[in-house]
Amino acid sequence: MSILAYQPLNLYTNYRDAAEAYPDVPIIHDEILPAFPELGYRSTYHSSHEIILKRAYQLAHLGVQAGDKIIIYKSSKFDTYLLATAAAYLGAVPAMISYHFPASTIEVFVDRLEDPYILFDEETENRVAAVKNSSPNKQIAVRNLLLQPAEPVGQTELPHDQISYMTHTSGTTGIPK
């Protein structure tokens, strides 16, 4: 019996490896993804990987870099995961947060993550505007991200023993942990 060896999770590296191993595997979307409209309704691992890199370069242009935390607070679509993968390419630490949370809960995240970037869309735009403790220059609307130049930058991997991805649970209190 073969036992799989432990490999650390890196969202970007795992996606890249899949794209290299299976470049022509189709990915079918049931809608145009707001943060990845170039993918249309049908793409492949290879083509989606290329656009993930473009989004990473655009995030870098806006100042996102290794070690930064970035809340991804947008409508529930597959592009949320793709944006987290782009952030991971830069060595930033994505925190994918449910778009159902009110501004007051996002303020708790902002405190706990020490003024992270917040990437948002039209679904969460008004709530982000109501967040009082977030630096405005760290608030990135998806529609503005898409307009940024995409100058290539290298991948940065965090040390394997460092947190590279965050999820949350609200438990019974409604406050993120």
Regions found by a protein language model. Give the residues of each.
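A short N-terminal helical cap/helix-turn-helix that marks the beginning
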Residues: 5-31, 50
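Conserved pre-ATP/AMP-binding loop-to-beta segment of ANL
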Residues: 23-26, 151-168, 175
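Conserved AMP-binding/adenylate-forming core of the ANL superfamily
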Residues: 27-63, 71-77, 83-85, 102-107, ...
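Conserved S/T- and glycine-rich ATP-binding loop of Class I adenylate-forming
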Residues: 70, 87, 163, 169-172
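Conserved ATP-dependent adenylate/AMP-binding module captured primarily in the ANL superfamily
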Residues: 84, 99-128, 148-150
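Structured binding elements
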Residues: 91
